[in-house]
Amino acid sequence: MTDAFQKLFQQMLQSGQEMARAFNPALEHFDMRAMEKLVPTIPADMLEMWFGKTFNREGLDAKTRLLLTIGAITVQGALAEPQLRMTVRQALAAGATKREIAETIFQMSMFGGLPAMQKALEIAQSVYAEEDEE
């Protein structure tokens, strides 16, 4: 990263923190990882409402929607690690297999690149390990 880009990035972070502080002082130090620990998976009723038949009765089921979400998050690279961890957990809860999740991530290598795919696979594997421990 160049110095100019690093400076711009820091300014953007600072601006975001100031905006969060202006909207809600409690959001200044919000950490998605804390939210992940608080709510590791969404209750089945809410999952079905958001991703399933309530809003889209004839469309995609929750599992398919979550696999698509995993694909979209994978392309973002390491920017959305907590979101990917939570979505992998949700997909498993919705009936997706580890193989389906891995294939979804593999497919995204063409769009997000190999580093993004590798990072997403590492994250998914860590979620699998956590699930196996439970």
Curated annotation (Swiss-Prot):
This is Uncharacterized 15.0 kDa protein in nqo9-nqo10 intergenic region. It comes from the Bacteria. GO terms for molecular function: peroxiredoxin activity. Gene3D superfamilies: AhpD-like. Signal peptide: none annotated. It is a peripheral membrane protein. It comes from Paracoccus denitrificans. The keyword Cell membrane applies. GO terms for cellular component: plasma membrane. Keywords: Cell membrane, Membrane. It is found in: Cell membrane. May have a role in the regulation of NDH-1 biosynthesis. Pfam families: CMD.
